C-alpha cells in the first residue's frame, strides 16, 4: 500500500513539474513574441524610416534621419539592429542628446504633427500594455512630450528617450531569451527557431545577461574605455 502511495505521489510530482514547465514555457514565448514585435516596430518607426515633421504655417520641416550606423545585423549585443534569430536590437542607450544630420529628404516627405503623434503615441501605448514596471516612467515621459509640438520636436530631434526605450526593450528580449533557453535546456520543450541562442551569440549574451548583475564590473569597464578614449585624444 505504501509503495502504491509513493508511486502515485511520485507520478503526481512528475506531472505537476511538467505542467509548471509547460506554463513557464508558454508564458515566456508569449512575452518574447510581444517584445520582438515591439522592438521591430520601434526599429521600423524610429530608425528605418526618416521622420520629417511639418511645422505647419511656417513651411519649415524638421528632419530626423536614421540615427548612427547601428542598422546592421547584431549578434545579441546591446547595440545593434535586427539579427536573424538573435537579438532584435536598437541603438545604444544614448546618454547625450544628438542632432540628426539633414539628408536628401524634401519637404514633400514631411508629415503633420497630428499624423506623427498618432503613430508614436500608439506605439508607446502598446509598450505600456507589456506591463514592464521599469518602462512605465520612460513611456509616460515620452507620452507627455508628445502632448505638444515643441515636446514632440524635442523627442524626435534628440533621440535620447527613443534610444533608451529601444535599448531596454532589446535588453529584456535578450534576458528572457536566455531564460527560455535555460528552461528548455533538458529538452523539456522546443525552442522556436527565432528564439534560439546560437553558438556565436553565447559569449555576448553571457556578458549581457550576467553583466547587469555586476554593476561594479560594468563601471570599471566603462572607465577603462573612457581612459582609452582620452589617451587617443
Curated annotation (Swiss-Prot):
Q: Where is the signal peptide?
A: 1-19
In this protein, the residues bearing a glycan are 104
- Quote a single Gene Ontology cellular component term: side of membrane
Principal cellular location given in the protein's record: membrane
Task: Summarize the PTM comment.
Answer: The p190 precursor is cleaved by SUB1 prior to merozoite egress into 4 subunits p83, p30, p38, and p42 which remain non-covalently associated. SUB1-mediated proteolytic cleavage occurs in an orderly manner; the first cleavage occurs at the p83/p30 site, followed by cleavage at the p30/p38 site, the last cleavage occurs at the p38/p42 site. The order of cleavage is essential for parasite viability. SUB1-mediated processing is essential for merozoite egress.
Where in the sequence does UniProt note compositional bias of the Gly residues kind?
A: 74-94
- Give the location in the cell: Cell membrane; Secreted
How is the protein disposed in the membrane? Lipid-anchor; GPI-anchor
Polar residues composition bias: which ranges? Answer: 58-67, 95-107
Segments of this protein annotated with the region Disordered: 58-110
| Keyword terms | Cell membrane, EGF-like domain, Glycoprotein, GPI-anchor, Lipoprotein, Malaria, Membrane, Merozoite, Repeat, Secreted, Signal
Q: Which domain of life is it from?
A: Eukaryota
Query: Is Repeat among this UniProt entry's keywords?
Result: yes
Function as written in the Swiss-Prot or TrEMBL entry: During the asexual blood stage, involved in merozoite egress from host erythrocytes possibly via its interaction with the host cytoskeleton protein spectrin resulting in the destabilization of the host cytoskeleton and thus leading to erythrocyte cell membrane rupture. Involved in the binding to host erythrocytes and is required for host erythrocyte invasion.
Known partners and oligomeric status: Forms a complex composed of subunits p83, p30, p38, and p42 which remain non-covalently associated; the complex is formed at the merozoite surface prior to egress from host erythrocytes. Forms a complex composed of processed MSP1 subunits, MSP6 subunit p36 and MSP7; the complex is formed at the merozoite surface prior to egress from host erythrocytes. Within the complex, interacts (via subunit p38) with MSP6 subunit p36 and (via subunits p83, p30 and p38) with MSP7 (via subunit p22). Forms a complex composed of MSP1, MSP6, DBLMSP1 and DBLMSP2.
This chain belongs to which protein, by name? Merozoite surface protein 1
